[in-house]
From Swiss-Prot:
Superkingdom of this protein's organism: Eukaryota
Chain spans, region Disordered: 91-117
Purpose of the protein: Assembly factor required for Rieske Fe-S protein RIP1 incorporation into the cytochrome b-c1 (CIII) complex. Functions as a chaperone, binding to this subunit within the mitochondrial matrix and stabilizing it prior to its translocation and insertion into the late CIII dimeric intermediate within the mitochondrial inner membrane. Modulates the mitochondrial matrix zinc pool.
Database matches in CDD domains: Complex1_LYR_LYRM7
Transit peptide (residue range): 1-10
Annotated GO CC locations: mitochondrial matrix
Protein name: Mitochondrial zinc maintenance protein 1, mitochondrial
Any GO BP annotation: mitochondrial respiratory chain complex III assembly
Matching InterPro entries: Complex1_LYR_LYRM7, MZM1/LYRM7
Quaternary structure annotation from Swiss-Prot or TrEMBL: Interacts with RIP1.
Organism: Candida tropicalis (strain ATCC MYA-3404 / T1)
Predominant cellular place of this UniProt entry's protein: mitochondrion
Compartment(s) where it occurs, according to its Swiss-Prot or TrEMBL record: Mitochondrion matrix
């Protein structure tokens, strides 16, 4: 199977996983992917083709790992539809970042007050 066809199928699978509960968005995403494939079908240069395939693979990876659909519930809260491929961070990068923020990083003090009207 060609790399282009494989990337195309992976993109369609990614949209199916991410947008499974939202038919209008699923349809729009798939239409956009198909449109981009058609627009790039006239590429002849192998480097341009490889770049287009890489871009499509990157889009698929981004969709699968970073996009989560949310549904508003009757109580006004949102229910997020995580799936098994959603990238969940462990907050280690946030903890590491606090060390470099300066003297107020992660500290509570009485000198910091909120303004009340």
């Amino acid at each position: 199977m060609s790399a282009t066809l494989s990337a195309y199928r992976n993109a369609l699978r990614a949209t199916k996983v991410v947008f499974r509960h939202d038919l209008p968005i699923l349809t729009a995403a798939r239409t956009q992917i198909k449109e981009n494939i058609r627009n790039n079908s006239n590429l002849k240069d192998t480097t341009e083709i490889e770049e287009a395939v890489k871009k499509l693979n990157d889009v698929s990876k981004f969709l699968i790992s970073n996009i989560v659909q949310g549904e508003k519930q009757d109580d006004g809260k949102y229910f997020l539809n995580f799936h098994e491929k959603t990238e969940l961070g462990d907050n280690e990068s946030i903890k590491q970042g606090k060390k470099n923020l300066g003297s107020l990083a992660g500290k509570k003090g009485s000198s910091i007050r909120s303004c009340k009207d």
